[in-house]
Amino acid sequence: MLAASLAGVCSLRAQTTNPLIAETRQAYTSVKGYLTRAAAAMPEENYSFKPTPEIRTFGALLAHIADHQMRYCSTALGARKEGTAATKTTKADLVAALAASFAECDAAWDSITDANATEMVGQRSKLGTLILDVMHSNEEYGYMAIYFRLKGIVPPSTDRSGAK
């Protein structure tokens, strides 16, 4: 088991020595954790909460993130897919859609190497597409933190209670 784990780490390191790829992937992993924990932590009754009438509900914000990730990460993999999270309303369905989008993004990140990072997919490089997705996810998570605070819940990124 240990040998297989070490082989996987060595394989990952063999794919890229580019610090930009490694650092951006680390940022992706971080926001993935925050968003996953946020989706789980928000009570289902608050998925319909809107801080003001003209902005998205918490559930719609989560759907927007999942659909954006599906679109961008599948594009980086070479075959753009449209997400279906916007058609979902229950917490379970939205959490599942978010998980599916992360599976697509994990595959996209696993596919990035020094050799293919600058290959163009549409108007951006593969790496540029993934960087844009990380930027968008962080921006949307920032909005999401406000929903948590307005409901009296500590957002995952600032929760120091040890919950991971």
Q: Model segments located where?
A:
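Sec/Tat signal peptide C-region and signal peptidase I cleavage site
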Residues: 10-14
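Bacterial N-terminal signal peptides
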Residues: 1-9
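Alpha-helical packing segments of well-folded alpha/beta enzyme cores
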Residues: 27, 31-34, 38, 94-108, ...
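Cleaved targeting-peptide boundary
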Residues: 15-21
